[in-house]
From Swiss-Prot:
Main location, first listed in the record: cytoplasm
Binding site for ATP: 176, 178-180
Region (Domain I, interacts with DnaA modulators): 1-77
Location of region: Domain IV, binds dsDNA: 350-471
UniProt-recorded name of the protein: Chromosomal replication initiator protein DnaA
The encoding gene: dnaA
GO molecular-function terms, A-Z: ATP binding; ATP hydrolysis activity; DNA replication origin binding; lipid binding
Record organism: Bdellovibrio bacteriovorus (strain ATCC 15356 / DSM 50701 / NCIMB 9529 / HD100)
Domain notes: Domain I is involved in oligomerization and binding regulators, domain II is flexibile and of varying length in different bacteria, domain III forms the AAA+ region, while domain IV binds dsDNA.
GO CC annotations on file: cytoplasm; plasma membrane
Compartment annotation: Cytoplasm
Length: 471
């Protein structure tokens, strides 16, 4: 058996037969073409062509292992695979560009971009959203390994809005990582390049409130006209809140469908994947998963240093190198925390008339040296948000099951991550005694073993805590 074009066609066919998500494979596997076979007879190298850098990045991150496994099972001998950017078209309305008009910072993988495509025709004159922040652009976003795929996806969507392969674009990650920045950056880029398009940027909570108000006032036709007929680009932040109301979720589902059917671009941001949004209907989840999903996580130390340098220059603050490293090292929770610490140092220095040095900064930010990287209240908030209850309910004495289980899980997580005493944990929950806490910990361990859904809830919460606390 030779590694040739027929062999690669066979591999793609076998992969599709094993995979239920044919939409994913149609989008990402189909465009991969056989280019050549190089290397030695003992270890041939299969060179496969991909259309562009974004495609290359996605395949390497998400499909490479599956491709290797399928080839290994079929070929049965040593081999290598190389994914080479060849510029072949994905489809008739997306072409590659080797000379983008903006050079992205970060990895070289981001430098090949998709060309613009004029594929959205509005029926009315432009009426762009006034809520876009003009300072949040691609040029002011510091790209790191944690965000390069999300950044590249947003940038390519902004250059080519409405493309089937990237609609909707769904960005997810913990709070304060830059998701909102990317939404605004995409909106600003589209507004600059496609001045005839009408852009709507809105939070899911505001969409929900307006929808509920329209239902009460019997003004749904007006509401639908605003979001479906009078807009060409829809940018929605904090999508997880859509699941709070059945009627709102229904309206949101049809709004997103209307946009996609009309080849109008939808970009969504959330703190979790669609499958992890409690209360989200299956059809809504499926619709959100049918486009492109990109995650954004906490930046590593190197990227935090780069972000801090950029912010310091923006705020005209001169920081010694040891100060930059110190602030970046202790600011582990989010980019917002990083910027907040910089502003705190700047303000203290100006008010006291003192030069910024390592000793001063350590004094200003001393609480970071002794403070846990996540607090009791923050864990409570994570659990409350996850189960759609209030922190106040967790601290109450109610024995209702929808409250008791989240309360017990919160106690378990606080014990695991903060190692607080049973007495201290009890005090945090409205003065519960240590026996109650001890029973709660035992109860959660039993639930983890007996209930897969609860085990998954705890796993998700632990991962979110890890994302906040890791360096």
């Amino acid at each position: 058996m030779e590694l040739n074009s027929s062999f690669w066609t066979l591999i793609k066919t076998k992969m599709k037969s094993r995979n239920d998500n044919n939409k994913l494979l149609d989008t990402w596997l189909d465009p991969i073409e056989y280019v050549s076979t190089t290397g030695s007879a003992d270890r041939p190298r299969l060179v496969l062509g991909v259309p562009n850098a974004l495609h290359q990045y996605f395949v390497i991150e998400n499909l490479q292992d599956k491709i290797y496994t399928e080839i290994s099972d079929t070929y049965g001998k040593p081999f290598e695979v190389e994914f080479s950017i060849t510029g072949n078209k994905i489809n008739s309305h997306i072409e590659t560009s080797t000379t983008p008009d903006e050079v992205l910072s970060g990895s070289e993988i981001l430098q090949a971009q998709l060309a613009r495509a004029q594929n959205i025709q509005p029926t009315q004159p432009r009426s762009s959203s006034d809520t876009l922040n003009s300072e949040l652009t691609f040029s002011t976003f510091v790209v790191g390994k944690n965000s390069e795929f999300a950044h590249a996806a947003c940038y390519n969507v902004a250059r080519n809005p409405g493309a089937d392969d990237y609609n909707p674009l769904y960005i997810y990650g913990p709070v304060g990582m830059g998701k909102t920045h990317l939404l605004h950056a995409a909106g600003n880029h589209i507004r600059e390049q496609y001045q005839h398009l009408r852009i709507t940027y809105i939070s899911a909570e505001r969409f929900m409130n307006e929808c509920i108000s329209a239902i009460r006032r019997h003004e749904m036709d007006k509401f639908r006209q605003k979001y479906r007929e009078n807009s060409d680009i829809l940018l929605v932040d904090d999508v997880q809140f859509i699941a709070r109301g059945e009627a709102v979720q229904e309206e949101f589902f049809h709004t997103v469908n209307s946009f996609i059917d009309s080849r109008k671009q939808v970009i969504l941001a959330s703190d979790r994947m669609p499958k992890d949004i409690h209360g989200l209907e299956d059809r809504s989840r499926t619709r959100l998963e049918r486009g492109l999903i990109a995650d954004i996580t906490m930046p590593d130390l190197e990227t935090r240093i780069a972000i801090l340098r950029y912010k310091a220059e923006k705020y005209n603050v001169r920081l010694p190198e040891d100060v930059v490293n110190y602030i970046a090292r202790i600011s582990k929770r989010s980019i917002r925390e990083l910027e907040g610490n910089l502003k705190k140092v700047k303000m203290f220095s100006e008010l006291q008339g003192l030069p910024i040095d390592h000793e001063l900064v350590k004094r200003i930010l001393a609480h970071h040296e002794t403070q846990s990287t996540i607090s009791v209240e923050e864990i409570m908030k994570l659990v409350a948000d996850h189960f759609k209850v209030r922190v106040l309910d967790l601290k109450s004495s109610t024995r209702a099951k929808p409250i008791v289980v989240p309360r017990q899980i919160a106690m378990y997580l606080i014990k695991k991550f903060l190692d607080k005493s049973l007495v201290d944990i009890g005090k945090s929950f409205g003065g519960k005694d240590h026996t109650t806490v001890m029973n709660a910990l035992e109860r959660v361990k039993n639930l983890q073993a007996a209930d897969q859904d609860i085990a998954k809830d705890i796993e998700d919460l632990e991962q979110r805590i890890h994302n906040i606390t890791r360096v």
